[in-house]
C-alpha cells in the first residue's frame, strides 16, 4: 500500500511555558504543504524492515517510521511484520516534520492493513508517543496545536497559497534549539488570534504580517544565513517570510506565481534545496 506523507510549515510558533518534565508548552499554527515523501508498506511474516532511497536515513529505531510501526504492532498484539519503503523528498532536520509525517503515514497505512476500525483519535494517542508534530500529521490541513502538540483545533483551511521554501546547507537539532531557548526572555509573542482571524477573512497580507516564530530568537543569532534568506525573500516579492519549526528551513509567502518563480530561480543559484509548493 502506497501513500504520500506531506510536510508541514508553521505559520506561527509560540512557546508559552515549560513543564516540570522539561517539555515546552507550545501554541502553533500548523499548515500542510504539497511537498511529500512516498511511503509504501507491505506485510511480511516477522519484524520491521526499512529501506530508503537516501543512504543517510537510519533504518532502525532512530527512524520515527520504525518507531511508529513498532508501537502499532505492540499495541495491537500483531504477530506479523512490515516492510517499509521510503522515497525521501522532504529535507531532513529541516523543521518540516519530515520524520513526523513519515511516522504518521506509517500509522495510517498500518491501520488500513491491520485494523481499519481504529479512529484517528486513537491513532493520535500512539502518535504523541512518537513526537509533538506527529498527531497533527495524522489529520493535516490547517490547525492550532497546543500543549505539547496533543491539543489540535482545526481552523479554516489556508489552502492553495504559494510558498517558496529554502533549506540551507545545514541541519538543526530540535532538541538543541529548544534547550537554548530562554522562555522568560521571549518579549514578543505571535498574535495567534489575529493570525487565525486573517486566515478566516482571506487577508493574505495580514497573514504575512502576523507570522512569527519565537525559535528564531535562538537560530537567527547563531546562523546569520537565515537572516539573509528572510531578507532575500522580502526583496524578491514575498509578502512575508519565516523560519518553519526549529529550522533551518525558511519560507516566503507569495500572492503571485511569477514572483515566486523568479524568487525560486534566484534562490536556486545559492542553495541546493529550494522548492515551490502550495498549502493544501
Curated annotation (Swiss-Prot):
SUPFAM superfamilies: GHMP Kinase, C-terminal domain, Ribosomal protein S5 domain 2-like
Functional description taken from the UniProt entry: Catalyzes the phosphorylation of the position 2 hydroxy group of 4-diphosphocytidyl-2C-methyl-D-erythritol.
EC number: 2.7.1.148
Domain of life: Bacteria
BP GO annotations: isopentenyl diphosphate biosynthetic process, methylerythritol 4-phosphate pathway; terpenoid biosynthetic process
Pathway as given in its UniProt record: Isoprenoid biosynthesis; isopentenyl diphosphate biosynthesis via DXP pathway; isopentenyl diphosphate from 1-deoxy-D-xylulose 5-phosphate: step 3/6
Molecular-function GO term, any one: 4-(cytidine 5'-diphospho)-2-C-methyl-D-erythritol kinase activity
PANTHER family: 4-DIPHOSPHOCYTIDYL-2-C-METHYL-D-ERYTHRITOL KINASE, CHLOROPLASTIC (PTHR43527:SF2)
Family of the protein in this entry: Belongs to the GHMP kinase family. IspE subfamily.
Catalytic activity: 4-CDP-2-C-methyl-D-erythritol + ATP = 4-CDP-2-C-methyl-D-erythritol 2-phosphate + ADP + H(+)
Keywords on record: ATP-binding, Isoprene biosynthesis, Kinase, Nucleotide-binding, Transferase
Taxonomic lineage: Bacteria, Bacillati, Bacillota, Clostridia, Eubacteriales
Keyword check for rRNA-binding: no
One Pfam entry name: GHMP_kinases_C
HAMAP family to which the protein is assigned, alphabetical: IspE
Enzyme class: transferase
Species assigned in the record: Clostridium botulinum (strain Kyoto / Type A2)
Name of the protein: 4-diphosphocytidyl-2-C-methyl-D-erythritol kinase
Active site: 8, 133
UniProt-listed InterPro entries: GHMP_kinase_C_dom (IPR013750), GHMP_kinase_C_sf (IPR036554), GHMP_kinase_N_dom (IPR006204), IspE (IPR004424), Ribosomal_Su5_D2-typ_SF (IPR020568), Ribsml_uS5_D2-typ_fold_subgr (IPR014721)
Gene field: ispE
